[in-house]
Amino acid sequence: MIMTYAPPPLNRPTYSTLTSSSGIRPAAPTPPAPQRRRKGWLAIPVALAVVVAGFGGGLIGSSMQQERPPVIIEQARPERVVTAQPVSATVAPDTAAVGAAVIPSIVTVEVGTEPNGTFTISGSGSGVVLDAAGNIATNNHVVEGGTAARVILSDGRIYEADLIGTDPLTDLAVLKVSADDLAPITLGSTDGLTIGTPAIAVGSPLGLEGGPSLSVGVVSALGREVQTGPETVLYGMLQTDAPITSGSSGGSLVDADGKLIGITTAVGVSSIGVEGIGFATPVEIVKRVTSEIIATGSASHALLGIGGDTAYDQITDGGSAPMGVDVRTVSAGSAAEAAGIQVGDVITAVDGTAVRAMDELITALRRVGGGDTVEISLRDGRVVTTTLATR
């Protein structure tokens, strides 16, 4: 997909990288950003600078941008006052029960070399058992750069692992071990998640011996766009304040029922104190990508064939609100052209899921694969069907 972004108008803080193998190192400073410009479309940075929390040295994140309207402050109007609704108390999750259910599904992934039959570890991360056949999900950045891998189960058993395949675009990978009595994790869904929903991270931080660790928090944001490297941007990420540290990459983020809602992938570490922010790849993307890797050794990705930007509508109080993706270009021979999508159209939904911004369109397309057929809703009321190309 062709994507266009405006340059960032705001300065961003400097972040530090952190991995289980490299400790703490200062990040390169984020370059100053140009001043805010008012020229019809306004832009602010979207993604935090983050670090991957596993093998291979921290990658310094930089800003990705998408267009946003100005923040407008006005005096309160009596007719628009909204009365806060009382919040009923809810039962806290039974974290002991969640731990008992999830920990057997979490493994430590050690990556290194084995030149003379002796395994030499160079870094470590976490993994999640997907099935009884021994397929294990982890992050691509955990396994890249190594020539050998082994897996340590929660009960201490150690197995050599084969790399089935990787997908750098989503930073996912699949390892496989031949072992009995595995405990596959139960997959959940992110569809019903709201900010404040309990979230529990289970992984192998710092490569510590003794089995996985559990930390508790909430889902603190949804649909984050996160850049973890020069060419790696992750979309639709879950944000959590459940502590995620070095070595936790590839571990699980689960809900109060112990069901997988994401694979922990990155953590924000800032020199100005912006900490306690972790990011997880949503389970829907994990399920699609790992299933394809298990079946074919690689994952496909959908290509619609448009270039565009977030479109904004003026609203009655003088502000503006995102309302879809304004199509700026349509590639010849693309799935978009075949569906009759034209420059000037505004995409508002994919398969019934609302799309208000460019990053939401990318997230929706990453949930499906190349060759899949989708329905695309347009602002003028049309709903078109097209088969997505593969890249």
Give a label for each model feature.
Residues 242-243, 251-252, 307-349, 354-356:
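PDZ/PDZ-like domain segments forming the peptide/carboxylate-binding groove
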Residues 112, 356-357:
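A diffuse structural propensity rather than consistent per-protein peaks
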Residues 2-15, 37-314, 332, 362, ...:
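Serine-dependent protease modules
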Residues 162, 291-298, 337-342, 348-354, ...:
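PDZ-domain C-terminal substructure recognizer with occasional recognition of PDZ-binding tails
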Residues 16-40:
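Intrinsically disordered, low-complexity cytosolic tails and juxtamembrane linkers
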Residues 154, 255-256, 317, 350, ...:
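Structural motif
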